[in-house]
Every structure is written in C-alpha cells, then in structure tokens.
C-alpha cells in the first residue's frame, strides 16, 4: 500500500500512472494473488528498511512446484514467521545472502545495512534434513561477498553443508 501511494505521488513514476501506462494494484501480506490460471503469489511482509514502502518476500505457487523468495530481511529472528517451517513447505527457497559475515562489512554498523549473514543462516539451517537444506539458494549477494567466487572457502563451505549459491542464468521449473 505505501509503494502504491509513493509511485502515484512521485515523478517520474506518477507520469506512468497519470498517462495510464501502468495500473497500480495493491497487494496485501498473506493474501494470495492469482497472476494466471496456474501461477499465484502470496506476499509475506518481512522486517527490513521501510523508508518508502513495506518490504515483502513472496511464496510463489506454480502448477507443479513452489518457491519462497526472500531477498531482503533484517535478521531471521526478527520475523514473526518461522523460516525453517516455510522452507519445509516449498520446493525452492531463494534467500537473502547479501553478506557472508561481519568481516565483509568491516567496521560498518550492521543496523544501517541489516541482513542475516550467510554464516548465521548456515547455523540456523544446520538441523534441516539434507532434502530441505538442498532447497536453499542464497541470492542477492553483495559484490564484496566471497561466496560469489566458486573457488572461495565461503562458497565451498556453503556447498559442503548441502546448500546452494544461486547462479546467474539458472532456471527453476514451477
């Protein structure tokens, strides 16, 4: 809802609305939206910086498979949902992997750039069975994230734990 108002009230986006180039449709957290006959989304509000709009992830439901898409979140423990439970309910989980660990951000205050570190996520997900760990793909990696490099210790650790780092150009059937 806040994003709808922001776009409609601020140029250059408001021009698209005024000229009817786009039609804004409000979506609401946890209310399923049918996009086509066999594809729907469920927005999931997540705690993250909300200067201009609410931040949401999505559960995406296709004709055969489903996915969880959470590219931005402050920390898993701040969410009123169980990320563990959500992972077990989908076929793929595309999750915030912005930063690998605190060393990557040097002396910056993590509260200014909040994201779960991949090493925190690895610890949180370690009790998932192999099938559920293998559903997880870290996405949204910052350019400084060592997991971007397949030869790095960071990348190899993620893979050794049974999780994945998403690769550009990959396709996932829904």
Give the residues covered by each predicted segment:
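Cap/insert and terminal regions of metallo-dependent hydrolase folds
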Residues: 66, 74-171
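Active-site HxH/HxHxD metal-binding segment of metal-dependent hydrolases
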Residues: 1-18
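A generic structural signal for short, solvent-exposed coil/turn residues
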Residues: 16, 33-35, 50-52, 61, ...
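Core dinuclear metal-dependent hydrolase active-site scaffold
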Residues: 24-86, 169-174
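A short helix-to-beta-strand connector/capping loop
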Residues: 14-24, 36-39, 159-162
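Generic hydrophobic secondary-structure signal
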Residues: 3, 7, 39-46, 58-60, ...
């Amino acid at each position: 809802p806040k994003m709808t108002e922001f776009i409609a009230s601020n140029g250059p986006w408001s021009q698209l609305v005024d000229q009817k180039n786009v039609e804004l449709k409000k979506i609401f957290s946890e209310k399923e939206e049918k996009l086509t006959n066999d594809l729907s989304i469920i927005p999931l509000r997540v705690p993250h910086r909300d200067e201009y709009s609410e931040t949401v992830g999505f559960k995406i439901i296709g004709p055969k498979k489903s996915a969880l898409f959470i590219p931005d979140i402050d920390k898993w423990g701040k969410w009123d949902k169980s990320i563990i439970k959500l992972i077990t309910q989908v076929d793929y989980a595309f999750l915030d992997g912005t930063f690998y660990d605190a060393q990557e951000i040097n002396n910056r205050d993590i509260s200014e750039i909040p994201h779960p570190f991949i090493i925190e996520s690895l610890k949180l997900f370690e009790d998932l069975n192999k099938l559920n760990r293998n559903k997880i793909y870290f996405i949204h990696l910052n350019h400084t994230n060592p997991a971007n490099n397949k030869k790095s210790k960071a990348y190899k650790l993620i893979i050794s734990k049974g999780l994945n780092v998403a690769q550009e150009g990959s396709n996932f059937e829904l």
